[in-house]
Amino acid sequence: MRIFNPLVTLALLVTQSAPVQAADLNGAWTIDASACGQIFTKENNRLSFKKDADLHAGGLIVQGKQITGTFEKCTVKSLHDDGATMRLIASCSDGVSISDVAFDLTFSGENNITLSSKAPVPVQMPYVRCPM
């Protein structure tokens, strides 16, 4: 049984009521804004995870069509804007297997999103963009 992965969730980043652009998704995202400094680092203008990032709130790094979590990497295959919600399909690899994953993304401000999945279990996760 596949569990909802927050890594794929980050790929759904878009500004509310605006056309989706790859640049809108770029950045470091987490469920706990106060943990940004414990999760992410920026060296030579590149974002990366700190060594023990998975021990804190966890998060996602979006760079173009690439979405990286602490245990999984995804490539966005498609984004479809349905008005208030955006539908994202990504091909994700955990190092062992590759699978396509679908998520819905809702924006609640410039730096806040909610990612949701209906299968295998309905899940909603709010994310905030870290100032990096």
Task: Tell where the protein language model's regions lie, with residue ranges.
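Bacterial N-terminal signal peptides that target proteins for export
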Residues: 1-7
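Short, solvent-exposed loop/hinge segments that bridge or flank secondary-structure elements
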Residues: 25-26, 31-65, 69
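N-terminal signal peptide c-region/cleavage motif recognized by signal peptidases
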Residues: 15-17
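Short, exposed beta-strand-loop hairpins at the edges of beta-sheets
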Residues: 104-106, 110-126
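Hydrophobic helical h-region of N-terminal Sec-dependent signal peptides
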Residues: 8-12
